[in-house]
Regions:
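Metal-associated gating/positioning segment near the N- to mid-region
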Residues: 2-68
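Active-site gating loops and adjacent loop-to-helix segments of metal-dependent hydrolytic enzymes
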Residues: 19-46, 87, 102, 107-110, ...
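Short, solvent-exposed loop/turn and secondary-structure capping segments
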Residues: 18-23, 75-77, 318-319
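His/Asp/Glu-enriched, well-ordered alpha-helical/loop segment
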Residues: 20-21, 27-40, 166, 207, ...
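Active-site core of metal-dependent hydrolases
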Residues: 42, 137-231, 246, 286-288, ...
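Alpha-helical segments flanking ligand/cofactor-binding loops in enzyme cores
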Residues: 54, 158, 178-181, 204, ...
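Polyanionic/metal-chelating signatures
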Residues: 49-52, 57-191
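Active-site environment of divalent metal-dependent phosphoester hydrolases
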Residues: 15-18, 48, 71-74, 174-178, ...
Length: 330
């Protein structure tokens, strides 16, 4: 006996770009020299030989988003990849699949506190986002009018403005979540909220938003003020309100291979079991715009399949076999 599931998916990680067991040598997550770097591409920093990757596969995780970090207001281009291969170009499912934005403490600390420059406040962070998106709109209009121009940072934002890919907003505190939503509405952006630590406080304000809330990581002590109050209960509260929720480890903040355990903890704290399974399969696939090929077992989709010895939320369960693209992997 056992359980067969689609390969598990985490919609927000830094695997391969913030490498296991390394210091600055393997830290390629944050280009903390400029708060606006939309032309930075995660695929250019991913090391397929990160030792965390086979550990994640052995836990049944087959697909992840690899994201730039959250020191920059606009951090760069997120990639959705399969966790198998030696050449990242062959691992990519979709790149870019989203653009990384960040609100809250991280940009303020990196630039205001450490460098004495903008953004020093949440006001400045939001203003920088608006100014950059307005500039990108003007650039796009000029280009569509036939002007011969090329600016890599502005080019990166055109798919976002055309709603071809979403913005992924790093936002913990309730007011930061609402600022992200405000800006997304102003520019008619598709979007997801990453972390959503304070979302329980404003469920009535956000329950009708057409967005995926990527909740977590919820294990461990709060590392900064905006993560105080983080709870495995949040995912269940949001799904009970009818919202789409994915669960994240935010690897390497917490290990990617704990993703099934995180889902189990959410169930223990009140989340519907089926919703928790969706939160590590089809919902993160939707957040990354790759649900046509992964996230469920269906004719025509990629054969990414995991065989568990028991219920995937039982801590004694082991992974019996993992298949990626129909091939059994170790």
């Amino acid at each position: 006996g056992g359980y067969i599931l689609p390969g598990l998916i985490d919609a927000h990680t830094h695997i391969g770009i913030s490498e296991e067991g390394l210091r600055w040598e393997g830290e390629d997550c944050n280009e903390a020299t400029d708060p606006v770097t939309p032309d930075m591409r995660a695929v250019d920093g991913i090391n397929p030989f990160d030792t965390a990757i086979p550990k994640a596969r052995r836990a049944g995780i087959t697909t992840v988003a690899v994201s730039p970090g959250s020191t920059n207001v606009i951090g760069g281009q997120i990639a959705a990849i399969k966790l198998i291969g030696k050449n990242v170009d062959n691992m990519v499912i979709k790149a870019p699949c989203a653009i990384k934005f960040a609100l809250g403490e991280n940009p303020k600390r990196t630039y205001g506190d450490n460098k004495g420059r903008s953004p020093m406040t949440r006001m400045a962070t939001a203003a920088i986002m608006r100014k950059t998106l307005m500039r990108a709109q003007r650039y796009m209009n000029k280009k569509e009018a036939g002007e011969d121009i090329y600016e890599p940072d502005m080019e990166a934002l055109i798919p976002l403005l055309k709603r071809e890919i979403p913005a992924h907003f790093h936002a913990h505190r309730a007011d930061d979540i609402l600022t992200a939503i405000r800006i997304a509405h102003e520019f008619n952006l598709k979007y997801c909220i990453l972390h959503a630590t304070g979302a329980e406080k404003i469920t009535d304000c956000i329950k009708d938003e057409h967005a995926v809330f990527v909740v977590g990581p919820s294990m461990g002590p709060a590392g900064k003020p905006e993560t105080v109050g983080g709870s495995f209960a949040t995912a269940g509260v949001l799904t009970a309100a009818g919202m789409e929720v994915a669960i994240t480890t935010d690897h390497d903040v917490t290990p990617l291979w704990l993703l099934p355990s995180f889902a189990a903890m959410c169930v223990r704290e009140g989340m519907n079991e089926y919703a928790a399974l969706q939160a590590i399969t089809i919902i993160p696939a939707k957040a990354l715009g790759i649900d046509a090929c992964v996230g469920s077992i269906k004719v025509g989709k990629d054969a990414d399949i995991v065989v568990f010895t028991g219920h995937p939320f039982n801590y004694l369960t082991e992974v019996r076999a993992v298949f990626i693209n129909g091939v059994k992997v170790e």
